[in-house]
Amino acid sequence: MSQIAQEMTVSLRNARTQLDMVNQQLAYLDRQEKLAELTKKELESYPTDKVWRSCGKSFILQDKSKYVNDLSHDETVLLDQRKTLKIKKNYLETTVEKTIDNLKALMKN
């Protein structure tokens, strides 16, 4: 009986660790989405057709429309990643809840 409880405790600890990592990744995606959105808004307010884009330690001259399209694509990728992470988060939350319930039931017996 104690072997099962130990295994469940390890499983619970692992699920909580993974859940924390998923929450951190979701927070990072939030920041990236906001950055892309704000950059896109800022670029759309510029009257010029060409803008300088950061590329590592240097800059390249690029069409504003191309840069805005790249940012829109990045936002789409971020939304897909967010969807996947939310599914994983839901799974991990369910796993944590069920493991806790099972541990409680095991301790009652």
From Swiss-Prot:
GO terms for cellular component: cytoplasm; prefoldin complex. Its main location: cytoplasm. GO terms for molecular function: protein folding chaperone; unfolded protein binding. It is found in: Cytoplasm. InterPro entries: PFD_beta-like, Prefoldin. GO terms for biological process: cytoskeleton organization; positive regulation of transcription elongation by RNA polymerase II; protein folding. The modification N-acetylserine is found at residue 2. Keywords: Acetylation, Chaperone, Cytoplasm. Binds specifically to cytosolic chaperonin (c-CPN) and transfers target proteins to it. Binds to nascent polypeptide chain and promotes folding in an environment in which there are many competing pathways for nonnative proteins. Belongs to the prefoldin subunit beta family. Heterohexamer of two PFD-alpha type and four PFD-beta type subunits. Present with 721 molecules/cell in log phase SD medium. This is Prefoldin subunit 1. It comes from Saccharomyces cerevisiae (strain ATCC 204508 / S288c). The lineage of its organism: Eukaryota, Fungi, Dikarya, Ascomycota, Saccharomycotina.
